[in-house]
């Protein structure tokens, strides 16, 4: 656990904001057909309509998670107390921890190679920020 304590909140915040930006961009490229939808979701998607539903849900969830981190960084003003923001970050930590395990069992090597590492970084960074007892400056 010492590593987590030396992992700065500012670095964790920069990591999550960068990764989430890239994830949003990636899913948008899947939606518009630049990246073939057959290589995502463990190759389980069978139609463009199915892909669009999955991608819209993913983009919505990612945007909500992005917003939580923006609130933690005080880049978005909110009425939510810090305790609620931190609770939401613990939920994000659990989500990305489970997501990391799910990706490891997915069907495609591309997902395993790239997204396992990114998901693990998100879990690690979420953990670090959830432990932080104050809002975090990203600068």
Across the structure, where does each feature detected by a protein language model lie?
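Membrane-embedded alpha-helical segments of multi-pass transporters/permeases
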Residues: 67-70, 104, 127
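Hydrophobic alpha-helical membrane segments
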Residues: 86-102
């Amino acid at each position: 656990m010492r590593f987590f304590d030396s992992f700065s909140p500012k670095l964790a915040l920069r990591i999550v904001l960068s990764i989430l930006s890239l994830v949003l961009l990636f899913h948008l490229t899947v939606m518009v057909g630049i990246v073939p939808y057959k290589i995502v979701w463990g190759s389980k998607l069978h139609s463009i309509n199915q892909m669009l539903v999955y991608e819209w849900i993913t983009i919505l969830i990612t945007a909500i998670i992005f917003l939580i981190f923006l609130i933690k960084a005080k880049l978005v003003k909110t009425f939510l107390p810090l305790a609620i923001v931190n609770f939401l970050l613990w939920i994000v930590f659990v989500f990305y921890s489970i997501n990391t395990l799910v990706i490891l069992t997915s069907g495609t090597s591309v997902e395993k190679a790239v997204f396992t590492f990114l998901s693990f970084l998100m879990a690690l960074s979420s953990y670090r920020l959830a432990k932080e007892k104050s809002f975090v400056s990203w600068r």
